[in-house]
Amino acid sequence: MHSPPLPPRPRARLLITGLVCSSLSLVLLVLVAVRWSPLMSLDTTVAESLHRDAVTEPGLVHVNRVLTDWVWDPWTMRVLTAVVVIALWWRGSRLLAGWVAATSLLATLVQQGLKAAVGRERPRWLDPVDSAHYAAFPSGHVMTAVVTCGLLMWLLRLHGAQQALWWGALVLAVISVAGVAFTRVYLGVHWLSDVVGGVLLGGAVVALSAAVYAQRTRWPAGTGESPL
């Protein structure tokens, strides 16, 4: 169903959000790359504080590992995205389905590319409570969660979801992103700046993708249809 174009203001907000997140991401990236002393000190302080607690709380560690390895795992998020893409394609929204899939893929490429480029080491412990491989910055778990939740929130808004549904989804999205960010630092496999970078980069990818889509398609803010 075609409706009047999306007003310029929402498109402008998306673009501004994307540019702000991109700029902050770039600043953080540079600070991490040059190992800016105040940031490194903050990362170390937070990591050591949480690790001291983690080694004395095996039950809480187990809960966090279940959450990070199953509930908020990147592959769980990718499966959720794939289900949404298939549903959109099945409903005939093939451009939108492709756009969501491409955005998710782009986020993964950006994430892996930056990990390789920065090559930041993860925290190392004599008594680790969990382990992870490859470079630390940005956090893949967090960036994938932000992109997945962000895309779902965008789709709900795009299809005119009821306010109660949209706000409920927003609460779940915030809990998911904050939750996975906490688990990664608490389990000692990421620095605080890694998860902040994941949030900023994920937000930048989603906002800029949505802004470009809105500009190219002139899609309405709400069509009265469900995204699923």
Where are these regions (language model features)?
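Divalent metal-coordination and catalytic microenvironments
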Residues: 46, 67, 114, 141, ...
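Interfacial segments of alpha-helical transmembrane regions
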Residues: 13-21, 80-109
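Transmembrane alpha-helix/helix-exit interface in multi-pass inner-membrane proteins
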Residues: 107-121
